[in-house]
Amino acid sequence: MQNLENIVAEALQAVEKASDVASLEALRVEYFGKKGHFTLLMQGLRDVPADERPAVGAKINEAKQKAQDALNGKKEQLETEELNAKLASESIDVSLPGRKTELGGLHPVSITIERVVKFFSELGFSVEKGPEIETDYYNFDALNIPAHHPARADHDTFWFDAERLLRTQTSGVQIRTMEKMQPPIRIMAPGRVYRNDYDQTHTPMFHQIELLYVDKKANFTELKGLLHDFLRAFFEEDLQVRFRPSYFPFTEPSAEVDVMGKNGKWLEVLGCGMVHPNVLRNVGIDPDEYTGFAVGMGVERLTMLRYNVTDLRSFFENDLRFLKQFK
């Protein structure tokens, strides 16, 4: 037991002299590790006579606990001293400005959607929505694009099976609305659409807004006036606007609308036309009694023109250096 007393005395003395947590950890390994002094003493119990073993074991545990308590106390003391020293070395200049809270902003595509919706809402158009997973009927057939129609090849459609697809246009919302509502109808349908295309001016997912107006006296003159007012309000300029004859299966007559750019060139912004009589018949509306016009615009296209963005893909890369410009 004389050896035990010496080990305890040496341990307590070494702990008291320890100047940092690292040296204290080295002492812990020396006395309590796998080959530490107290570990070897416990292993030596097997050589002690059986009748003396409990008493000897109790003394070793008592000595071990004494050394452990000293080690724990010294560790707590050293950690407190280190923390106080660190706090004393760090100072806060209360005259410095505080850290600013970064505020987010709307995505440029969302800004455009809000502007378009606000303009047409003030003219009595309501927002209607439909499913992004659409059926062949609502995406094509009901819009006067039957299975054999060559216009289907232009859509680069994502198909799930023979009947279900990711919608290539929000026009299906027009069909669903006309099925459940009676004229007069005045709606807009903003939403995501999908086409299998990816380059500087195309992405597999993009946004469209379509307008539909159906009434007994809807005509192309109204359509032209509406779009003139919208484009000048959206771009906040007295733009020169032109309508070019075009072709869409679901409108007749059809037109594409251009605005004069600052470089003196015409820039295409949207498509429009009078709703085709076949489309009205497909939803049970008599084309001899009612007429209508429809407008389709690409949100990213409008946003690119308004903010002079040259690469459509910039809208979807989440680059804060780009997005912060629109706050």
UniProtKB/Swiss-Prot annotation:
GO biological process, one term: phenylalanyl-tRNA aminoacylation
Name of the molecule in the record: Phenylalanine--tRNA ligase alpha subunit
Location within or outside the cell: Cytoplasm
Domain of life according to the entry: Bacteria
GO molecular function: ATP binding; magnesium ion binding; phenylalanine-tRNA ligase activity; tRNA binding
Keywords: Aminoacyl-tRNA synthetase, ATP-binding, Cytoplasm, Ligase, Magnesium, Metal-binding, Nucleotide-binding, Protein biosynthesis
Annotated catalysed reactions: tRNA(Phe) + L-phenylalanine + ATP = L-phenylalanyl-tRNA(Phe) + AMP + diphosphate + H(+)
Stated family: Belongs to the class-II aminoacyl-tRNA synthetase family. Phe-tRNA synthetase alpha subunit type 1 subfamily.
EC number: 6.1.1.20
Listed NCBIfam families: pheS
SUPFAM superfamilies recorded: Class II aaRS and biotin synthetases (SSF55681), tRNA-binding arm (SSF46589)
Subunit structure: Tetramer of two alpha and two beta subunits.
GO CC annotation terms, alphabetical: cytoplasm
Binding site for Mg(2+): 252
Cofactor or coenzyme needed: Mg(2+)
Cofactor notes: Binds 2 magnesium ions per tetramer.
Organism this protein belongs to: Glaesserella parasuis serovar 5 (strain SH0165)
